[in-house]
Structures are given as C-alpha cells and as structure tokens.
Regions:
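Amphipathic alpha-helical segments
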Residues: 1-2
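Conserved beta-strand termini and adjacent loop/short-helix elements that scaffold enzyme active sites
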Residues: 8-10, 15, 97, 123-128
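Solvent-exposed, non-transmembrane amphipathic alpha-helical segments
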Residues: 18, 25, 32, 84-85, ...
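Domain-level recognition of nuclease-like catalytic cores that cleave nucleotide substrates
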Residues: 100-159
Length: 159
C-alpha cells in the first residue's frame, strides 16, 4: 500500500524479528519530515505518542491508530482527539485497535461527546489477525484502503 508509518516515539525501540521496529523500511523517523505536518508544530507534538499514523504520497494520512492493550481506551481516544484539534480538518480514519472483548468499551467511550467528532473505527484483534493471515497466505497485492475498511467497524451511534 506504500504507506510510510509513524510509530510512537516511545515504541521505536521494541524488537521484532531481532530488529528494532524503528529501523524497518518505511518507518517515519521524524514527523517534522512529513509534508502534511511541516507547518503544524502543535500537531507534531500531539502526534509523538500516537501508536501509529499512516502517511501516503506526502499528501495523504489514511489512518491515525491507537492500539489499546495495557492502557485504557480513553487515553488513546484522548491522544487522537488532541492531535485532531491541532491539525486543520483533514480526511483520515481514527482507529482504535483493541481486544475483541473490549468492543463495548470502545463503542461507549468513542460515543462520549468529547470524542464523537473522531468518528472512530474499531479494529478488533481478531480482524487484525484474520487480515494478517490472509495477506501472508495469499500474498495479497494491490490492497486498497476500502478493503481495509471492511475490517474496521464504524462505532459512532446516530441519534
């Protein structure tokens, strides 16, 4: 998909397959180098601790994601909201990746008044695993953002 990926500043030292994730190809080393964020220092500061941000073609930001495993859903939503409030309106997905059993908590928190404008999507661990296995088994190419959307549930409740 040719995404460049920001990994939270505090997570870049995590080792995967005997290599720090911050050393993999396609990892953004400094948010200040991303064209979209160059003029928005406050947004850059707000994004430093966000778990994952995808960038594409220097002009797009397909997703801002928080992986909730040990921290609460609210903290991830707060980080994304803080970022959104410091960046001009821009089309992107705000995604919470969390265990399947946390779905109700994600829905409940994402629908609180302070988070509603994120229009959060929920990406359960089981869907991440299913997508990963499918990509590995079939060696999928040409995956689109719309295809990924099939694995992410919109959680904003209308009314």
């Amino acid at each position: 998909m040719n995404f460049r990926t920001w990994i939270a500043q505090n997570d870049k030292g995590i080792v995967y397959n005997n290599k720090r994730i911050g050393e993999y190809e396609g990892i953004v080393h400094s948010l200040k180098d991303e064209n979209l964020l160059k003029s928005f220092d406050d947004a850059v500061q707000a994004a430093l601790m966000i778990d994952c941000i995808w960038f594409k073609n220097g002009k797009l930001m397909p997703a801002v994601m928080e992986v909730e495993h040990t921290t609460g859903v609210t903290s991830g939503l707060s980080r994304m909201k803080n970022f959104k409030d410091r960046f001009p309106p821009f089309p992107t997905r705000y995604v919470v990746v969390a265990p399947d059993e946390d779905r109700e908590k994600v829905v409940q928190e994402a629908n609180k008044p302070q988070f509603r404008d994120l229009d959060t999507r929920y990406f359960p661990y089981s869907a991440v695993e299913e997508l990963y296995v499918l990509c590995q088994r079939r060696r999928l190419r040409g995956i689109t953002e719309e295809f990924l959307d099939c694995y992410m549930e919109p959680v904003l409740q209308v009314g």
